[in-house]
Amino acid sequence: MGLFSLKKQIAEAAAKSAAAAPKSNLPPEKESLYEAMVQTLLKESKTSMGMMGKSSTKAAVQLLYPNEIPKYAILTNVSLGSLAAGDVFTPKGFKNKTNVVLIITDERLLFAGALGTPIEKVIPLEEICVIDDSNITSVIHSVLRVEDAETILAIDGNKQVLGAFCAELKKAVRKRKSRT
């Protein structure tokens, strides 16, 4: 999906959802853009096995967070030793192990795939965490700051790990809400 097509779909979806009430503390115009992006990317994930090209990945980050630098990125099933400068995602995944990167800011959690581009060129990283089935829970509780499970944007990847991650995330969100 090219950058032009992505922007066109986002604009169309944003126009339709502009009247919807915001579900978070984001400004209404940003909330409608976010909701449009969610719907666009979820639709895309069902038609292209969830893998996005570098242009649409950059567009997703820049349109949602034009003034923010993502604080964390989590790469699933990737050893830290493979994250040398210039490492790239390939059509088979990052070093043939994964095609999913979780982009986290203070407000939102995004899932996005990036193909054929050095990851440091797509996402400025302050910290990298690696998750697998054994440490999903500890990563969620120590790193993620997500107030609303509805903010999850899930692009298909490693379904077993991604499914477990989402389940744990929702549990963590419910526990946090019950304490407030």
Annotated model-derived regions:
Residues G2-L102:
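Anionic N-terminal interaction surfaces
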Residues F4, K175-T180:
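Short acidic DE-rich linear segments
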Residues P66, T76, G86, I131-D132, ...:
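Intrinsic-disorder/low-complexity regions
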Residues V78-S79, E126-E127, D156-L162:
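A short, sequence-level motif marking secondary-structure junctions
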Residues G81-V143, E147-E150:
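Phosphoinositide-binding peripheral membrane targeting modules
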Residues D148-E168:
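Canonical phosphoinositide-binding patch of PH/PH-like domains
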Residues C166-R176:
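Edge beta-strand at a domain terminus
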